[in-house]
Amino acid sequence: MLTTEKYQGLNWSKNHGLIPAIIQHSISGEVLMLGYMNQESMAITEKTGYVTFFSRSKNRLWIKGESSGNVLKLINWYPDCDFDSLLILVLPQGFTCHKNTNSCFHPALTDFSFLFQLENIISIKKNHTSSHGNQQSSYTSDLYTSGIERIAQKVGEEGLETALAAVSRNSKSLIDEASDLIYHLLVLLQHESLNFHDVIQELRVRSKLKKKH
């Protein structure tokens, strides 16, 4: 984590007291935007936990989301090797871009960013089904209406079909079945108020444990 002592040691002389800051989604890895910060905006960001920039066009401090409410919650930040730019990891609330897209670089999605968006769509369908019933019938909504037993059954079925496709050495079939398995696994995780990020964190822990032994 970048502390006050460390950010005061950044190279502020290169760009007239400003540092370019790359904003990245802390879970999906999607690059959201580029902004500029001075020492005052960094101090406010550290104090409030929400990203504040220095606007070059307005010539003042600018809290991201001050008018739209689409703020950027600070998760972590890192200087680059030359200490003249920043990578800031955030959890965005709402759209980041003023054009109502998740990223100002839309639609430059990485593979994992797509997976994160798919998970968000599944979550929306789950919440809508929970609060309004299955008014807008879809396969995902039908699964949530059926309940955990049906969802778990589908994960088991798709897992078996994935294994059989692998044994048959059919690459196309394996990709198809693995896609079905991952989709139904995401549905299951969302049903239990979990997500793929939780799985990744567990894998990180296991990886660290293996390195120690």
From Swiss-Prot:
It is found in: Cytoplasm. Residues 1-114 are annotated as: Phosphoribosyl-AMP cyclohydrolase. It comes from Blochmanniella floridana. The gene is hisI. It catalyses: 1-(5-phospho-beta-D-ribosyl)-ATP + H2O = 1-(5-phospho-beta-D-ribosyl)-5'-AMP + diphosphate + H(+); 1-(5-phospho-beta-D-ribosyl)-5'-AMP + H2O = 1-(5-phospho-beta-D-ribosyl)-5-[(5-phospho-beta-D-ribosylamino)methylideneamino]imidazole-4-carboxamide. Keywords: Amino-acid biosynthesis, ATP-binding, Cytoplasm, Histidine biosynthesis, Hydrolase, Multifunctional enzyme, Nucleotide-binding. Its EC number is 3.5.4.19, 3.6.1.31. Pathway: Amino-acid biosynthesis; L-histidine biosynthesis; L-histidine from 5-phospho-alpha-D-ribose 1-diphosphate: step 2/9; Amino-acid biosynthesis; L-histidine biosynthesis; L-histidine from 5-phospho-alpha-D-ribose 1-diphosphate: step 3/9. Pfam families: PRA-CH, PRA-PH. GO terms for molecular function: ATP binding; phosphoribosyl-AMP cyclohydrolase activity; phosphoribosyl-ATP diphosphatase activity. It comes from the Bacteria. This is Histidine biosynthesis bifunctional protein HisIE. In the N-terminal section; belongs to the PRA-CH family. In the C-terminal section; belongs to the PRA-PH family. Residues 115-213 are annotated as: Phosphoribosyl-ATP pyrophosphohydrolase. InterPro entries: His_synth_HisIE (IPR023019), HisE (IPR008179), PRib-ATP_PPHydrolase-like (IPR021130), PRib_AMP_CycHydrolase_dom (IPR002496), PRib_AMP_CycHydrolase_sf (IPR038019). The lineage of its organism: Bacteria, Pseudomonadati, Pseudomonadota, Gammaproteobacteria, Enterobacterales. One of its GO terms (cellular component) is cytoplasm. The keyword ATP-binding applies. One of its GO terms (biological process) is L-histidine biosynthetic process.
